[in-house]
Amino acid sequence: MVEIDQKFALSTPTGLGGNFPLKHDAPKGKHVCFVDNGNQYTELFRQGVKQATTALGWRLTVIQADQNVASSYGSAVTSSAQAGCDGVIMPSAQYANYQSQVPGAAKRGMVIVDANSSNKVGKGVVKVLSASKLQYYEGAATANVVLKHMAEHHPKGDVTIQTVMVPQFENVFKPILDGFKRQIAVGCGARCKVYTVNDDLSVATGPNPSAPFVAALQRNPETDYMIQSGVTDSGLVAALQQAGLKVPAIIGTAPLQSQLRDLQSSHPTTVAWVAQPFITYGWFMVDGLVRYWADDKPYDPWAHLPDVKWALYPSNVKDFVDGGQSAFPKGYQQLFESMWKI
């Protein structure tokens, strides 16, 4: 029997999950730096940050980092300080990669927003969208999508599941895996065997990104489910078919444009994707700075709320996708502007 914990059930994303007006008006004339490491998710975050800073009348400078070079994040903090930024948004980076630059930034009066990570950070750093909570919830919600599919297609017998870990982004992937594995254990018990494929970033972004998954399915050819991330899914189905392997049911998290297009095609190759509105996340990141500067006791009001996400299937994907990207909740810009009193 498959059990689904409703605590992690997905619901239609009609709002941000709360309404938290500022105590004081949002400040004017701020200069914000955004660290762009070239990752496809970061590019989407940047779009939201651009929208939000424009709405506030703030200046935005984009500072480049290299996701394959750990030291580039610290250099990005230094460059942000040299550019005269009042705040810098650092998405999905390991804290150790820029920790040594934090004291110098604080002395200059520059605050750092650590966004979308599970880092434990020190003074001078504001956490927004903590992956310890939000990505854990994402993993558990993804497990519920799997359990629902299992109830229909694998009501009895053992089930083999392959998941993915990208070591360079462990602070994001680990909470997802923790939430997923716990929820699968609760809902499926000993029936489900969960394995994890280590997909190094250099391979995931290289000429043969599917090699680790092909090898994993060669070891376990009867795999029933492959849990993917949008950034690791490139060319997976074609690679498995070319290797003569059975293509398992693919359920993923954080789809990018190629996965969303696939869901909308006449013959989708994946079952479902638990989607996050990454452009909206950029607004959350700017919200962290707004509250830091405007409120007497700044805090992240979103830290204890369920993440904004939805399970996208071929049957409903068109309801939640706008211009090739997940765009929800509807009117999110106006919701933030109302809280910011602009």
Question: Language-model segments: which ranges?
Answer:
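Hydrophobic alpha-helical segments within soluble ligand-binding/sensing domains
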Residues: 17-18, 130-160, 175, 209-210, ...
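Structural recognition of the beta-strand scaffold that forms the well-ordered cores
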Residues: 32-35, 42, 61-63, 87-91, ...
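Short, solvent-exposed amphipathic alpha-helices that sit
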Residues: 41-55, 138-145, 171-193, 208, ...
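Short beta-strand elements in bilobed, periplasmic/extracellular small-molecule ligand-binding domains
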Residues: 54-67, 160-163, 184-207
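Hydrophobic alpha-helical
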Residues: 88-107, 180, 198-262
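Flexible loop/hinge segments that line or gate small-molecule binding clefts
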Residues: 100-137, 160, 257-265, 269
